[in-house]
Each structure stands twice: as structure tokens, then as C-alpha cells.
């Protein structure tokens, strides 16, 4: 067995898709060859992806697939063999279609219990790698996640083909030998191209294992992850030399990795006067427009220096590159400074009226109309949270005003952030300005939550207005489609209620949102569906945080209004299940639930001690009365784990009750009294969670 290399050398590939394209191409080739039995168990696949190439290296590849014994079912005997013992036309046709040529006597007869069937057992000859690789390449190309196809003309001037970008060379080597395949009008060979600017002649790849070394000699680093690691390490090194730290967002690192074949880091700078502009504006300008890495000093303050990733090895040490990029960024930052200076000439409050001209949703009105609804919800949320109502109302009114500014018009990512700066410039109260920034939080999974009660009130109002409104017009998420990010909004509400331990009812908040939304034409009351949606998101969130399906179901079965204590309930249930009494009590609890479900009408919880006849029911009643006060006190204190430990003491009397007492006694009074005892017991046992859901 020998190692295989395949490379498609292309024009520049779309950077944001390069990693996926590289991995998918390698996996497609690997899977197809593995399915055709060209690979060994020891085969290792390595994907390569650079701006102008997709490649895959696979170890331990066979030059020819092994012969394969196979067994083919044909037709029933009664269909395939005539009365004369010869093959019928139906059998002859079937065998011809499968390429089988043998005598009827060579076929095997097998009784499958219904019919006697004819089978053929033969040997399928192995095929050369060229055939297998041809199919593998076609399969891999067909299954690539191509964001947008480009159609281009081949060298013959007639034929057109479609691919993500034009392919210029096709390399296919098994060891040192060329594997003859054809793709995109190209015949395979060993030639490829190196760096666009630092090499000029084609490169002949000597063998599959020399690919990486030869490409590096031609100033191409084909391994995507290696390039990224080099970029990240060099950025950190250059930043440290300046006693600074580079701001390296994940998406920017990925993009520059996909844009460079041979990364080289250079330093540049801009005039310090631009530092008067909020640093978020400067950083975003550098990242989005120029792909620069901004630098912060040790105190977290933005510096007027930055790092950039090039793929040119400059003869002058990068002086011209640095100066050129300084000129480019100067123009960009001048625009940002202009926007900032112009925006501050008008107060946020003066921009609120302009929200009438900003469409929120064609069925839900303008941002101005939405702002009025958010203010109503924020007032209710502030009352429930004990937040400053005046400041919450002010923040809700101004929260979207920065949508009318030049800066946010240019950089929508800065909405809320610029609102805070402009509010501070207008001398708004500190918590009002902060709430304008924080009401968008959490923007994504793991993002920080709003930090003040005013911010929380406005953030809850903003997200709940979105949810109640869009649910009200039927814009629910479906499958993977969630164009309005409603799952993220719901998760944000849940995180705020739980992680901030807010003593607030979720249904009460939803009711407040509905009161603000109900007068919008065409909006229907979908509160029940919205609560179910929240329950589903909460279940997913709990599972992601380590709760088992049973633990989550047990707690959520309580249909809790207030969610702040859910983590403690999950922890209590988990600890309870480690107790030796847990298995018996959960089984008994499930049994009690089934008994109570079968009762027609309402079951009273009023127990008449005089009707307790059996020793076991008397004992259970006394034990329950002894446990109840302590259990209720522990529950009131939120000590759920201790409460469940306390009720674990009921295991023995519960077991004895079911062993000796007939619940459905013939005497109606006795039966009702025993059901009342069980209902009261059931209520105590399930105060923290519905523990029957934990039964095995």
C-alpha cells in the first residue's frame, strides 16, 4: 500500500467557505475510496486548504481494490426455472442485467420460509485505483458545500463547467506515480503552482509525501490549521514586543487564514487624534474593512498601532506595506470620526421621532410604534423587578434612537453601543445610558447579561415584545429556520430570569407583553404557544448544562412560574437519586400518581384519623404529619436538597402501606380517606419535582 495525494489548484476560493470546502473535499474522497475498499483500517486522511487549492493526503491506499465475494438474490425458483428444468426468460433477463453468466445448475436454492429462491454466488473482480479515484473525485465535488457556483469556459473555448472557482491544475499521485483521472476538462498530472507572487514556474510534485515540503519551498503553507497557528502565534509575539495585546476575534482569524498562503505579519499605525472616537468604532472599522488586528495596552486601552497579515515577503522589511496601510486606515478612521462628530450634534431624544420612518415589521409597524410597546412592557417589568420605573421608561424610549445615527447606519453592529456613548454625551442618567447598551444582551450564547435592574427590565421588555409580536402573527421558528432569532431571544429571557435569580413570574411577564401588543391589528393571542416554546428552550438549556432528560422532565413537570430556583431543584433531584431510598420512593410515587389519575372526580386532602384502620396506614399518617412541617420549612427556605432528604424517611412506611393496605376498599368512606392520604403524600413528595419522572 502507498500514500495518495490529490490537489485541485484553483483561482482564489471564497475565504469564509474555505475551511468547510477543504474538510468536505477530503472527507468526500476518503468516504468514496473507503466504500470501494481502497483504504486500510490504518489509513489516515489529512485535509489541506489554502486560498488557491483544495488537497487531500491519504495513507495506506491500495493500487487495486481486492476481489470481493458476493451473493446475489435473483428470483423465486418457480419464476426462474421452467417445467423442463431450464431457465425461464425472466431469469435470463435478470442474470443478463446483473452481468451473471452461468448454468442454472450453478445457482443456489434457498428456502426463505415463504418461497424457494435462486441465489448466485460469485467473485467481483477488484478495480484499478484510477477508476475508484475518478468516482471519488466526482462524488466529492458533487457533495461540496459550495456557497455560490461559478460557470466558466474551458481552454477549448467551447465547453463550460461549473465549480466554486475555476480549476487550473489537477494533481493525483499514488506514491510517485500519476493516477490517471480527469476532472473539469483537466487530465491529472504532477504539476501545480506555488505562491502567486514569489514563484513563477510550475512545480512538479515528486511524490505524495513530498507535497507539503515542496509547497512550503514555493511559499505556500497548505495546512489550514498550521497557517492559523502561525498567524496567531506571530500576532501574539509582535503584540508582546509592543507591550500590547492583539484583539483577535475568531471570525477574523479564520478569514485572514483563508486569505493568505504564506502569512507575514506587519505593524502599522494611525494618528492618535482618532483615539477620541469610541474604540469600538475604531476596532470595528479596522476589522471589517481592512482585516486589521487592533492593539490594546495592558490597561485595555486602544493603541494607535495595529497589526496586519499579508502574504508578501517585503524586501524593505514591510515599510511600504506599513505606510500604504496607514494611508488606507486614515481615510476609514476619518469617516468614523466624521460620523461621530456629526451624530453628537443632535440628542438621542431628538431622534426618537425619526423612528416613525424605520420599519420594524410590515405587520407590526415602525420602530416608533414598537418603542411605545416596549415602554409599556418595561414599566411592568420594572415594577416586578423593583427597578427605577422612570429610568426604565427613559431607557426604553431611547433604546433604538441610535438607529437614526450615521455611525449605526454605517456599522449596524454598533447599535446600543453608540447609543450609550451618545446618551452619556447628552448627560442622561448613568443607568439609562448603560441600559441602552445592555438591553441587547445577551446577544449570543455565553454573552454577558445586563448588569443593573434598569437594564434587565428593558432587556426583558425588548425580547418579550419581539417574541409576543412575532408569535402573534404566526412567525414561529420551523426546523433550522429562525430568521428572527426567536430561540436566542427566548434563551436570553431564560438566562436573565435564572442566572440573575429574578423573583419574577415568566407568565406574568408574558401577560404584560400581551397587554402591550394586543391592540396591534392582526396579532392573535399566542401566549400558550409561547409558554410551550419557552418550556422547550428551557429543557434544551438544562440538557446542555448537564441535566439528564429525566431530571429536566421531573423539574419542568412542575410548570413553575418562577424559574430562578430551577438549578437548585435540578441539583436536589440529582442528590436525591443518589439516596438508597430513591428507587423505591420514585416507584411508589409513580404508583400513587397512577392511582389518583384513575379516580373520577376531585380527591380531597382532608384525612379523618378515625377512619384509619390498618396499622400501616396509621403509621404512614403519623410519619407524614411528623415530616410535613420540616419539609415545608425547608421548601420555603429554598433548601430543596435537604427537603428531599427529609421525605426519604417515608420510604419504610410507604412500602409497608402498599404491602398491607387495600387502597380501593369496598367501603366508600375508607377508600376516600386512603385516597386523601395518598394525595397529601403525593403533594409533599412532588413539591420540588415530579419524582415519578425519575422512576426506572
Residues of each region from the PLM?
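Amphipathic alpha-helical "coupling" segments that flank catalytic cores
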Residues: 1-696
Amino acid at each position: 500500500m502507498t500514500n495518495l495525494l490529490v490537489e485541485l489548484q484553483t483561482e482564489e476560493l471564497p475565504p469564509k467557505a474555505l475551511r468547510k470546502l477543504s474538510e468536505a473535499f477530503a472527507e468526500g474522497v476518503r468516504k468514496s475510496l473507503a466504500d470501494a475498499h481502497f483504504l486500510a483500517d490504518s489509513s489516515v486522511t489529512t485535509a489541506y486548504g489554502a486560498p488557491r487549492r483544495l488537497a487531500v493526503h491519504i495513507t495506506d491506499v491500495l493500487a487495486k481494490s481486492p476481489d470481493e465475494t458476493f451473493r446475489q438474490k435473483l428470483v423465486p425458483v418457480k419464476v426462474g426455472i421452467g417445467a423442463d428444468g431450464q431457465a425461464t426468460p425472466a431469469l435470463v433477463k435478470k442474470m443478463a442485467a446483473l452481468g451473471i453468466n452461468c448454468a442454472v445448475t450453478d445457482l443456489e436454492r434457498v428456502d426463505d420460509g415463504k418461497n424457494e429462491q435462486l441465489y448466485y454466488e460469485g467473485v467481483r473482480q477488484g478495480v484499478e485505483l484510477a477508476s475508484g479515484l475518478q468516482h471519488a473525485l466526482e462524488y466529492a465535488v458533487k457533495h461540496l458545500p459550495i456557497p455560490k457556483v461559478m460557470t466558466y469556459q474551458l481552454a477549448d473555448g467551447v465547453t463550460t463547467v461549473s465549480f466554486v472557482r475555476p480549476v487550473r491544475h489537477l494533481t493525483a499521485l499514488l506514491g510517485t506515480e500519476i493516477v490517471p483521472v480527469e476532472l473539469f476538462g483537466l487530465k491529472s498530472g504532477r504539476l501545480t503552482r506555488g505562491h502567486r507572487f514569489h514563484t513563477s514556474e510550475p512545480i512538479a510534485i515528486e511524490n505524495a509525501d513530498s507535497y507539503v515540503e515542496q509547497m512550503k519551498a514555493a511559499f505556500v503553507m497548505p495546512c489550514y490549521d498550521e497557517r492559523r497557528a502561525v498567524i496567531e502565534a506571530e500576532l501574539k509575539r509582535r503584540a508582546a514586543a509592543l507591550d500590547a495585546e492583539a484583539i483577535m476575534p475568531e471570525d477574523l482569524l479564520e478569514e485572514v487564514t483563508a486569505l493568505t498562503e504564506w502569512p507575514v505579519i506587519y505593524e502599522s499605525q494611525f494618528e492618535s487624534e482618532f483615539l477620541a472616537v469610541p474604540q469600538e468604532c475604531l476596532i470595528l472599522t479596522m476589522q471589517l474593512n481592512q482585516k486589521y488586528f487592533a492593539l490594546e495596552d495592558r490597561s485595555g486601552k486602544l493603541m494607535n498601532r495595529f497589526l496586519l497579515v499579508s502574504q508578501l515577503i517585503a524586501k524593505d522589511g514591510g515599510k511600504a506595506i506599513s505606510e500604504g496601510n496607514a494611508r488606507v486606515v486614515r481615510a476609514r478612521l476619518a469617516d468614523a470620526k466624521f460620523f461621530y462628530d456629526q451624530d453628537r450634534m443632535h440628542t438621542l431624544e431628538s431622534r426618537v421621532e425619526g423612528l416613525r420612518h424605520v420599519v420594524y415589521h410590515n405587520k407590526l409597524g415602525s420602530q416608533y410604534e414598537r418603542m411605545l410597546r416596549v415602554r409599556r412592557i418595561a414599566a411592568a417589568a420594572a415594577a416586578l423587578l423593583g427597578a427605577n420605573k422612570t429610568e426604565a421608561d427613559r431607557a426604553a424610549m431611547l433604546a433604538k434612537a441610535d438607529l437614526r445615527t450615521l455611525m449605526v447606519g454605517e456599522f449596524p453592529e454598533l447599535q446600543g453601543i453608540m447609543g450609550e456613548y451618545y446618551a452619556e454625551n447628552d448627560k442622561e442618567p448613568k443607568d439609562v445610558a448603560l441600559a441602552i447598551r445592555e438591553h441587547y444582551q445577551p446577544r449570543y450564547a455565553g454573552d454577558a447579561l445586563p448588569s443593573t435592574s434598569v437594564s434587565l427590565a428593558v432587556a426583558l421588555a425588548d425580547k418579550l415584545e419581539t417574541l409576543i409580536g412575532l408569535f402573534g402573527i404566526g412567525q414561529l421558528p420551523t426546523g433550522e429556520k429562525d430568521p428572527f432569532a426567536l430561540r436566542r431571544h427566548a434563551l436570553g429571557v431564560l438566562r436573565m430570569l435564572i442566572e440573575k435569580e429574578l423573583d419574577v413570574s415568566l407568565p406574568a411577564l408574558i401577560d404584560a407583553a400581551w397587554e402591550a401588543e394586543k391592540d396591534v391589528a392582526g396579532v392573535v393571542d399566542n401566549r400558550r404557544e409561547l409558554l410551550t416554546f419557552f418550556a422547550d428552550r428551557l429543557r434544551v438549556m438544562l440538557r446542555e448544562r448537564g441535566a439528564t432528560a429525566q431530571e429536566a422532565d421531573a423539574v419542568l413537570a412542575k410548570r413553575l412560574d418562577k424559574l430562578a430556583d430551577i438549578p437548585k431543584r435540578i441539583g436536589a433531584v440529582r442528590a436525591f437519586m443518589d439516596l438508597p431510598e430513591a428507587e423505591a420512593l420514585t416507584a411508589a410515587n409513580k404508583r400513587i400518581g397512577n392511582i389518583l389519575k384513575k379516580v373520577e372526580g376531585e380527591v380531597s386532602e382532608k384525612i379523618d384519623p378515625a377512619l384509619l384502620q390498618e396499622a400501616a396506614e396509621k403509621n404512614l399518617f403519623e410519619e407524614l404529619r411528623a415530616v410535613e412541617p420540616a419539609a415545608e420549612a425547608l421548601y420555603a427556605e429554598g433548601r430543596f436538597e435537604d427537603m428531599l432528604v427529609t421525605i426519604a424517611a417515608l420510604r419504610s412506611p410507604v412500602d409497608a402501606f402498599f404491602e398491607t393496605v387495600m387502597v380501593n376498599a369496598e367501603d366508600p368512606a375508607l377508600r376516600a380517606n386512603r385516597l386523601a392520604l395518598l394525595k397529601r403524600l403525593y403533594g409533599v413528595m412532588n413539591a420540588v419535582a415530579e419524582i415519578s419522572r425519575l422512576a426506572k
